[in-house]
Regions:
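Intrinsically disordered, low-complexity regulatory segments
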Residues: 2-133, 137, 143, 162
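Prokaryote-biased recognition of long, low-complexity C-terminal linker/tail segments
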Residues: 128, 132-191
């Protein structure tokens, strides 16, 4: 049959201004931004739009879809969002493999699972994405408006911020290092 490959996340969560026009302008008075219902959108890029049209057409005419996304939360989320955006109506099965050997791939296709078996994994990924959106969009705007200088964006994120804190703390340790005297012990062993 037909084959397709989805290589990227074509459909992320919507931007703040996609939910409310007043959220386009960065203002403390608009915080916190909490959409009544989160939605996805197609990335505005001619290459992505063209690729999505092909995928959408194939999905509309398919008798069955096999989700071959990465075996994990993010792979599940990326593929589900594309299928949702494309309006896929046919049955969906899941290829779940963690090895790319010929044998593993063959076994995976012989043991396809119902997409519904992965609903909790999708919901976990969706919850993570929404949490990242809420923290990132709101905290970035808050810190930028309060502390950013010369229109400098201060980006805040669930992974990025603690990682940067580790780097800053380590740099401070290096800069504040004070050598201390120490002794070396030398011993002689006898048989």
């Amino acid at each position: 049959g037909s084959e397709m490959c989805i290589r990227d996340s074509l459909c992320p969560l919507k931007e703040p201004h996609d939910y409310a026009q007043e959220w386009k302008r960065w203002a403390l008075s608009s915080l916190p931004m909490v959409p009544p219902r989160f939605g996805i959108k197609l990335i505005s890029n001619p290459t992505y739009e063209q690729q999505f049209k092909v995928i959408e057409s194939l999905m509309q005419n398919a008798d069955m879809i096999i989700n071959c996304g990465d075996a994990g939360q993010e792979g599940e989320l990326i593929q589900r969002w594309v299928m949702q955006k494309a309006g896929a109506k046919c049955p969906v099965y899941r290829l779940w493999i963690s090895s790319l050997t010929e044998e593993a791939i063959r076994d995976g296709f012989q043991q396809l699972k119902e997409q519904t078996e992965f609903n909790k994994l999708y919901e976990a990924g969706l919850s993570r994405a929404i949490g990242d959106w809420l923290l990132g969009m709101n905290a970035t705007r808050l810190y930028t408006l309060r502390y950013g200088q010369n229109r400098q964006v201060l980006s805040i994120g669930r992974v990025q911020t603690p990682t940067l804190a580790l780097i800053v703390n380590r740099q401070a340790e290096i800069e504040n290092f004070k050598p201390e005297p120490y002794w070396e012990l030398k011993t002689i062993y006898r048989n």
